[in-house]
Amino acid sequence: MRIEQELKLGFKDVLFRPKRSTLKSRSQVELTRNFTFKHSGRQWSGTPVIAANMDSVGSFAMAKALSEHGVMTAVHKHYTVADWAEFIKENDASVLKNAMVSTGTSEADFQKTKDIMALTDDLIFICIDIANGYSEHLVQYVEKVRAEFPDKVISAGNVVTGDMVEELILAGADIVKVGIGPGSVCTTRVKTGVGYPQLSAIIECADAAHGLGGRIIGDGGCSCAGDVSKAFGGGADFVMLGGMLAGHEESGGEVIEQDGKQFMKFYGMSSQSAMDKHSGGVAKYRAAEGKTVLLPFRGSVHNTISDILGGVRSTCTYVGAAQLKELTKRTTFIRVQEQENNVFGKE
């Protein structure tokens, strides 16, 4: 047993220190990033925010809506090959280039991914997703997928430390997904005692990834636009959002009426709700590690994503970053014990 004494930080522990800026307006800030990925050599241009691969967020409808903003969607893995064929038939490359094909690590998952990717050359992203990215099985699976798809962009996770980021990149991942337990409907930290404060995880993992020419996704922990900016400021190349994009008509969640008001069900992918739906219940050897909540129905996602991106632009103006890629270089975080004045409640 050993104890690390260094303090690790979450988004609530810091604020940006404002800096002199020559920008006159938020409209001058460029959020588009251009990436060339390490192993695949693929190029991608867009706004590096990703809707999470949860079946009450990462739907086909979400992918179509967010592509209008240049934003990506990690489409959840529970669509069938036939579902994908229909989606591909109805949408062009401008939508498909922003859709990630999510997969687990079983042999059936591998075959399904091959079948989906064979439908079109316009799909370029594969998201390999398991809860515990520290498994040697994941490293071996990344190697297998890389051998099968040498020209596709592969994301793999989730992990929270630089050593595992490096191992996954060396195995063939272009992008590593960072985050264990910070999500709004994730209870892994409570059920297992395992986790890592998200901002420190991003800072440390970004350093490891960038040293090898890889990229990271900050996955989870964001509850407001300011948190998204903090993730970018900490070095995240992409930021993945679940709860902030849940509850919309494009989210794919179940709509429930109570007392004349509409709500949408939102749940973690290791929750009892998810396992009842997709796995026939919680296996005897495991515990559910997610919660189920009802969110007030929020209408179209277009207003929400515009508000989030507007907040990130505003952050950039406060620190003098004319482009999103400059934000981390312009970032100085100050440690704080307060974030906002809640005398009239939270927004």
From Swiss-Prot:
EC code: 1.7.1.7
UniProt cross-references to Pfam families, sorted A to Z: IMPDH (PF00478)
UniProt binding sites for NADP(+): 108-131, 216-239
Keyword Manganese set for record: no
Broad class of enzyme this protein falls into: oxidoreductase
Alphabetical GO biological process terms: purine nucleotide metabolic process
Alphabetical list of InterPro entries matching this protein: Aldolase_TIM, GMP_reductase, GMPR, IMP_DH/GMP_Rdtase_CS, IMP_DH_GMPRt
GO molecular function, one term: metal ion binding
Chain sites annotated for binding K(+): 181, 183
HAMAP family: GMP_reduct_type1 (MF_00596)
Role according to the record: Catalyzes the irreversible NADPH-dependent deamination of GMP to IMP. It functions in the conversion of nucleobase, nucleoside and nucleotide derivatives of G to A nucleotides, and in maintaining the intracellular balance of A and G nucleotides.
Subunit structure: Homotetramer.
Protein name from the UniProt record: GMP reductase
Organism, scientific name: Aliivibrio fischeri (strain MJ11)
